[in-house]
Each structure stands twice: as structure tokens, then as C-alpha cells.
């Protein structure tokens, strides 16, 4: 296994703000969750190696990425994986992930823009801007958005939001904050 500093020596020389803006070993940047130590970097390198089928490939194909996501129990369509790749590439390419892009995807934290985007569908239903919607609205929102969530998954989300049994409401601000915390800990 190669050392993390050897992955791409010119990454830190690239312009700031680019997906590859930070060096791999011990980098710290506003878009990342924090310093990435050698152990975490080695684990990510191993994960990348596994996803490339143990080959010394420079890219995880979109098909292998789709298979890996499905093997984790996430039911996404090929188009959703392609959308993810477009976001990561920041253009229309959907051909797969190179290691620096994989690192960005696996270590990027949730920022305020992402949190605002998560709030947007709820705010459409919450005309009074109270921060809560009914459990019925919550369930309908997920069904209408095309999410294939089970009743148990919706219940887990409602528990994260600390729903009130008496009031039959979901505090979506609490839910979004809890999800952001959980995602940033991953």
C-alpha cells in the first residue's frame, strides 16, 4: 500500500476551491470535515482499492460505484448515481470517480448551503415558518419526492426530529440539524 503523501504530489499545488484543492495527507480545508490523519487516509485508500476490484485502477467506474451503493443497501437508480457524479465532477461527466474525487466525496462536510437545500421542501409546507410540519405532511413529502423509504425509516427520521406524539408534528429544523451532525461524523 502506498503512503498517502505519494497519492498525488501536485494536489496541494492546484487552485483553492477546486475539488482537488487540498493535499491528501493531513489536509484541512473549509470543505472537509477536519484534518485527515494517516490512518483515515489509509482506510480511504483501501476502500478505493476494494471498489476498483483490487486493481491499480485510476478510476472507479460508474457501474462499480452503482454496485457498491446497492451493496450497502441504498436503493438508488443509475440516474441518481450519475447525478452524484455530476455534482462531484462539477460538470456533466458521469464516467466514474478518480481518487481525489473519491476523497472529496467521502470527507466533505455538510455546509450551510446544503442545510438550506434540505430545508427548502419543508419550508414550502410550513407557510407560517414555525419549523414544524404535521406527521402526515412529513410522510407525504417523502412519498411525493420519490424516496423509497420504509415505514421504519420514516419513523427513525421522526425520532431524530423528536416528534411530539401529542401534537402530531415533526420539528424539521431539529431533524436537519441532527442529520447534519450525523453526516459530518461519518
From Swiss-Prot:
PROSITE patterns linked to this entry: EF_HAND_2 (PS50222)
UniProt key word Kinase: no
GO CC, one annotated term: myosin II complex
Keywords from the named record: Calcium, Metal-binding, Repeat
Highest taxon of source: Eukaryota
Signal peptide stretch: none
Binding site for Ca(2+) 2: 126, 130
Region (Disordered) location: 1-23
Domain EF-hand: 41-76, 77-112, 113-148, 149-186
InterPro entries xref list: CALM/Myosin/TropC-like, EF-hand-dom_pair, EF_hand_dom
Residues holding Ca(2+) 1: 98
SUPFAM superfamilies in the record: EF-hand (SSF47473)
UniProt GO molecular function: calcium ion binding
Miscellaneous remark of the record: This protein has four EF-hand homolog domains, two of which may be functional calcium-binding sites.
The protein's name in its UniProt record: EF-hand protein 5
Species annotation: Leishmania tarentolae (Sauroleishmania tarentolae)
Native organism taxonomy: Eukaryota, Discoba, Euglenozoa, Kinetoplastea, Metakinetoplastina
Amino acid at each position: 500500500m502506498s503512503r498517502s503523501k505519494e497519492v498525488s504530489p501536485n494536489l496541494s499545488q492546484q487552485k483553492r476551491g477546486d475539488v482537488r484543492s487540498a493535499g491528501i495527507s493531513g489536509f484541512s480545508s473549509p470543505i472537509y470535515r477536519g484534518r485527515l490523519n494517516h490512518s483515515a487516509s489509509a482506510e480511504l485508500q483501501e476502500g478505493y482499492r476494494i471498489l476498483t476490484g483490487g486493481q491499480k485502477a485510476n478510476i472507479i467506474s460508474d457501474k462499480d460505484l452503482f454496485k457498491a451503493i446497492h451493496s450497502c443497501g441504498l436503493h438508488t437508480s443509475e440516474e441518481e448515481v450519475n447525478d452524484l457524479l455530476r455534482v462531484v465532477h462539477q460538470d456533466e461527466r458521469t464516467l466514474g470517480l478518480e481518487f481525489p474525487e473519491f476523497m472529496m466525496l467521502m470527507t466533505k462536510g455538510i455546509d450551510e448551503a446544503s442545510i438550506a437545500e434540505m430545508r427548502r421542501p419543508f419550508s414550502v409546507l410550513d407557510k407560517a415558518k414555525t419549523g414544524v410540519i404535521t406527521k402526515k405532511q412529513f410522510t407525504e413529502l417523502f412519498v411525493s419526492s420519490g424516496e423509497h423509504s420504509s415505514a421504519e425509516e420514516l419513523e427513525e427520521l421522526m425520532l431524530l426530529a423528536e416528534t411530539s406524539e401529542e401534537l402530531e408534528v415533526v420539528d424539521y429544523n431539529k431533524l436537519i440539524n441532527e442529520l447534519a451532525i450525523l453526516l459530518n461524523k461519518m
